[in-house]
């Protein structure tokens, strides 16, 4: 289960950092002289959001290899809950980044 833990932690860190960076970019962009810096920070937020999807696909692939992955199994339940939580979080960050742009 180490592989699931590693992928989960990576996805969690990607979303946490993406959200933090876009929030910083929004705050920094309020100062016209810092707009270029804010733009770079926003690009980094976008990169972390994109990287989340890379790990998400890897997680999906690994979960699909597990026998009897469904809501009745521990791994199936974990997958369902994790996927739903991350999807909502991802959507919120994506909206922030689009609003920034």
Which residues fall in each region the model found?
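Non-heme di-metal
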Residues: 1-101
